[in-house]
Amino acid sequence: MTDTEKSFKVVLLGEGCVGKTSIVFRYIDNIFNDKHLMTQHAGFFQKHINIGGKRICLTIWDTAGQERFHALGPIYYRGSQGALVVYDITDNDSFIKAKNWIKELKTMLGNDISLCIIGNKCDLEKTRVIPLADAEAYAKSVGAIHYSTSAKLNKGIEELFLDLTRRMILNSSGVVIHSNTNTTGQTTNRSERIPIVPDSDSGNKQPGCCSN
């Protein structure tokens, strides 16, 4: 990060196999791997963008979603300015678990964090089990914005991160970012993917395949 850049920490939460890492890969490097394995550790990615004439460095923390990693969550989202809580629109349990993540976030970080709830895998609309209206109503009830995305089809990803960044800028400085602000000229530096806290038990578990 340069002296003129503003840095924001964003934490990515949700159960395993909802497509969290696929969303980040699509945003950072515009790639999608339908053979992507379940994340077995936490790590972060960085992207540098220009938005509203401001230089922004986003540090996006991707966390493992398995139950045995849940207790580590507070370690990673402490100090975050933004949170993306992801669920799979074809998996009701993932939506229930997303609500648990949000309760925990609210308890620890209060209402100051910019919160987005993401219904991922919208390319599987025919098998949707979470009504969009229900998800949007829940998001509104907790002060969040709901987004529908598909990492596979690259749908809604760019808009999600740009809108989140605008909200974090607004929360941190009070500067109003108008909806007609030109944000299409964003630039990126080489992204960094640095795994941390490796899973010492990963060799004993057969990872699942998670994408979309």
UniProtKB/Swiss-Prot annotation:
Q: Which InterPro entries match?
A: P-loop_NTPase, Rab21, Small_GTP-bd, Small_GTPase
Mind telling me which CDD domains this protein's record contains? Rab21
Q: Which GO terms describe its cellular component?
A: cytosol; early endosome; endomembrane system; lipid droplet; pathogen-containing vacuole; plasma membrane
Task: List, alphabetically, the Gene3D superfamilies matched.
Answer: P-loop containing nucleotide triphosphate hydrolases
Quick one: which residues bind GTP? 14-21, 62-66, 120-123
State its location(s). Cell membrane
**Which top-level group of life is the source organism from?**
Eukaryota
Q: How does it sit in the membrane?
A: Lipid-anchor
Alphabetized, the UniProt keywords read: Cell membrane, GTP-binding, Lipoprotein, Membrane, Nucleotide-binding, Phagocytosis, Prenylation, Protein transport, Transport
Region of interest: Disordered = 181-212
Q: In the record, which residues receive a covalent lipid, type S-geranylgeranyl cysteine?
A: 209-210
The main place the protein resides is membrane
* Listed Pfam families: Ras
Q: How does this chain assemble?
A: Interacts with LIM domain proteins limF and ChLim.
Report the protein's function. Answer: Involved in the regulation of phagocytosis.
Name of the protein in question = Ras-related protein Rab-21
Q: Which gene encodes it?
A: rab21
